[in-house]
Structure formats: C-alpha cells, structure tokens
Amino acid sequence: DPFRPQMLGEGGLGLASAGAVIDAREAHFAAVREMFETCTVFIFTLGLTEAWLTEDGMALPVPPGVLGVTEGASAASFHNFGLSEIYQDLEEVLADICIVNPQLRVIFTVSPVALAATFEPRHVMISNTLSKATLRLAAEMMRERHARVCYFPSYEIVTAPVNAPGAFEADLRSVSPLGVAQVMALFNRHMLSGGEAAAAAPAAMPAPSLNATASPLSDEERAAYDARARIICEEDLLATGPGP
C-alpha cells in the first residue's frame, strides 16, 4: 500500500520511483479486490478518529514529518472525524463491498490500543476516550442497522475493570501477549464455534486471571511477537519514533 511507506521498500524506507509506486498500487488493489470478492467474513477494526488529509482528501497513515519526510507536509491538514462522518463512511464501504460479495458478513471491533498523541488542544487521555466512544457508537449503529453485521468486544475485554491486571504492557497502552491471548480465546469460543450463537458476544464477560490462562512466552516467542506488532500500526511511530 503506497500510503504505508514503512511497509514497502528496502528497510521500510519506501519505494524508489513513481513507477514502482504505481506497480505496487496495482498489485495492492488487485489483492484488495480478491479479498473482498472471495472472503466470507470481514473483520473491520476501528482504531482512531484523528487524521491528516492531503489537499485532494487522501488520508496519511501518520502526521506529516513523522517519517522524516517534510516535502508536502505543509499541504496536509488535521481533521478529527465525527460520528456522522464515520457512520456514513462505514455505510458506503459496506454497500460497495456487498456489490461484489452479497453474502459477506462483517465483524466490527474497536482497538483497545490507546492513542499515542493528539493534535487537539487537550490531554491525550481525553482525546482517546472520545475517539474510542465515537468509534464504538458507529460500530453499534452499523450492527443495529444491518443483519450481516455483528460486534466483537475486544475493546471491552481488554479495558474493562473486571479484567485481571496484565492486559497491557508496561507503557499502559500496548496490549500485552497475555491480553491478546485472552481476546483470541474468547473470539474462538464465541465466534468460531459454528453454533447459532457464534455471531453474538456473550451477555457477560468472564473475568479470568490472564496470568492463569496463558503460558509464559519464551524469549524467541516474545521477539517474534514484538517484530510482528511493529508492522501493525504506523500510529505507534508517534510514541516510539521511526524505526531503523
């Protein structure tokens, strides 16, 4: 995806030419088309509401300058998407996908990973709460309107006070391997069972000890997890800076 430059090129430094970007774009779009045409269930995770937009309306993966590229940075503008915008976008995306895949089912989730920074003139915790609440409500509106849509509470599983300590890393933002294991265990139990209740979240979430339900990770497993986690979201660059 050319809009995610750290995912492409040697050392994650982006592609070398405009022609290479065009080629990568065509391959990316072909893969996206194939995915939407052939998948039976699409899991759509909503992460944050703040964005930086180019003059023609394209959204950047990180704020201008974060990756060390200043060219064109002044042309990008900050935008914090509101509930009505997000809901309209989700409706349009779902309608477009269902044209090529009428039988598709969609599972919405909200990421429990907190914002690393905010451009709004307020504390990041306040922006994070508003962002997650807005996305959660948008997902609920989609669930209420469409029979093909359901919601899986990964956000609630990790952040609920009833959960045991250990769902977050030491930075209190990143979800720990124990937290991921808890989410996936509940997802497997309630969404992959094959029964009629598989599309619905449980009425009451259990509160098992994370430390009691997941085996300790070896150093090799932890290194592999950390390496994979680094490529998931460029928003992490706001907290850690660009990688090598």
Indicate residue ranges for each PLM-predicted region:
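Extracellular glycan-modifying ectodomains
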Residues: 1-244
